[in-house]
């Protein structure tokens, strides 16, 4: 259940990034609108530019965090909420057990054949 919580949290973070990108576009549009006026209001331009810059920095920071997380997941490194590594180790152990059983059965047959020979 914790895995779903983390996944939902990641999705909420991506939705917030999407809203922030919409704010960036809105700020850029407002700045362009202000620049298109005959006498642009410098204070308004500064405010729009500051909001634009702050939003871009937040998006960059959040996306970097998301990319770091995805890099960890994609490379198979252990990360919170993942059981991939443990499942892989368990599967490999079961495969080794099966292989050992096959080899022991072959060895047993060989021993029996050797004992049956006069």
UniProtKB/Swiss-Prot annotation:
Family matches, as Pfam families: Med11
Keywords: Activator, Nucleus, Transcription, Transcription regulation
InterPro entries noted in UniProt: Mediator_Med11
A biological-process GO annotation: regulation of transcription by RNA polymerase II
GO cellular component, as recorded: mediator complex
Coiled coil as UniProt keyword: no
Localization per Swiss-Prot or TrEMBL: Nucleus
GO terms for MF: transcription coregulator activity
Oligomer status and interactors: Component of the Mediator complex.
Family: Belongs to the Mediator complex subunit 11 family.
Purpose of the protein: Component of the Mediator complex, a coactivator involved in the regulated transcription of nearly all RNA polymerase II-dependent genes. Mediator functions as a bridge to convey information from gene-specific regulatory proteins to the basal RNA polymerase II transcription machinery. Mediator is recruited to promoters by direct interactions with regulatory proteins and serves as a scaffold for the assembly of a functional pre-initiation complex with RNA polymerase II and the general transcription factors.
Protein's UniProt name: Mediator of RNA polymerase II transcription subunit 11
Species for this entry: Xenopus laevis (African clawed frog)
Organism phylogeny: Eukaryota, Metazoa, Chordata, Craniata, Vertebrata
């Amino acid at each position: 259940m914790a895995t779903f919580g983390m996944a939902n949290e990641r999705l909420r973070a991506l939705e917030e990034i999407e809203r922030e990108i919409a704010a960036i576009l809105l700020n850029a549009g407002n700045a362009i609108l202000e620049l298109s006026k005959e006498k642009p209001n410098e204070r308004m331009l500064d405010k729009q530019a500051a909001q634009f810059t702050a939003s871009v920095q937040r998006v960059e920071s959040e996306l970097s965090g998301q990319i770091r997380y995805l890099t960890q997941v994609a490379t198979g490194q252990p990360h919170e909420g993942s059981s991939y590594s443990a499942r892989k180790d368990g599967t490999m152990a079961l495969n080794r057990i099966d292989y050992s059983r096959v080899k022991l059965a072959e060895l047993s047959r060989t021993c029996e054949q050797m004992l049956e020979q006069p």
